[in-house]
Amino acid sequence: MFPEDEAALSDAILDTAGPLQILGGGTRRVGRISEGRKLSTAQLKGIVLYEPGALTLVAKTGTPIAEIENVLAGENQMLAFEPMDHRVLLGTQGTPTLGGVMAANVSGPRRIQVGAARDFALGISFVVALANY
């Protein structure tokens, strides 16, 4: 299942009676892996709002970190927490995404000085098991 918006994601969850295997950018697997129906967040991507003067960016969970960094670089800005790309260390492929960074709190060497990834999140919306969003 590859839902393209929150409503389709909600429907996919409601239509599944058993366990779900949530798939993101595919850079690494964390936790107990479910053998359930596969549900990908890959199509839930894109920058919804960017206000450089307010240092505010809103993006969907499947948005690649590289896309966010490119947009920020255009305004001489960056992600202060420097999300680490684990692919080389883990020998994996895939695309690091905003959802993965926030879920795993992936932060680089500046974490000690400026804070972790989640410290920069002003808000997060998500679909719960009852398919509310």
PLM region spans:
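FAD-binding subdomain of flavoenzyme oxidoreductases
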Residues: 82, 91-133
